[in-house]
């Protein structure tokens, strides 16, 4: 994946910081005051490095469409398969290197933010430049404070990592970790998924947004941390990405929260003959459907909850849930599930 520069590139490396090619220049682009927070779902990034490279180019087109339409864009993303792969890799390395200290989940989360952010910002920058838009794109390593007394710690349910044998599961439990038995008789580790309370780097994100930069932040819901005196200590947990995205949109006073997933619309009575896609609905409608149990806990429920929370804490806001291919149409109100 890494590329060594060739001596034949000429003026491509004209400036010492090698950020701009010869034809590029920084331009001040007139923008509206609209801020849109875009949350990329786990299927928007693939499950392998080659898939991720392709997927981020697709995501970059959606982001560039929104920038071109006059938005200040902040992007968050899932890290579901990625953080699990990193965690597994660190554990496997530790087995063959006994002196190696196992990487905690908070560190794995930070690693995932770095390498996903790298691919995203590279793809977004390239897509913007191809359209004649010269805007800085930055990834912010983002910590999110959680509540140590959150009920989620009593009932961990987020599955991570590879399949474990019964012996490996017992070893994990002896370390104080939680595991669950799957339907096929194998095991996997599970983590608590507490709600986000505070985004530590919020003012850094706000400063870059106000400066007109495209910002990637709160990847994977953020690195879960707990305040201990002057320090922030990493927590063995994962945070629901959509809830953090909603909180970030709320605290940035964004105009729109756009959650991009694998389907065009949210549906009620999903998977039944009475399935019905939702188009324009109110917050009251959304709360009613949530109360009815219309949405899966690890699927549409956190998305709808994030949308409702964002909308209830501001005036004139819009939430959109749609597919990545329909991002611009969703922004324009032409498709997707639009909640106001």
Labelled PLM ranges:
Residues 9-11, 23, 249, 257:
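Intrinsically disordered, low-complexity serine/threonine-rich segments
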Residues 30-340:
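C-terminal catalytic "cap/lid" subdomain
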Residues 1-16:
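Single conserved hydrophobic/aromatic residue that forms the stacking wall/gate
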Residues 17-27:
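Short, positively charged and aromatic/hydrophobic N-terminal segments
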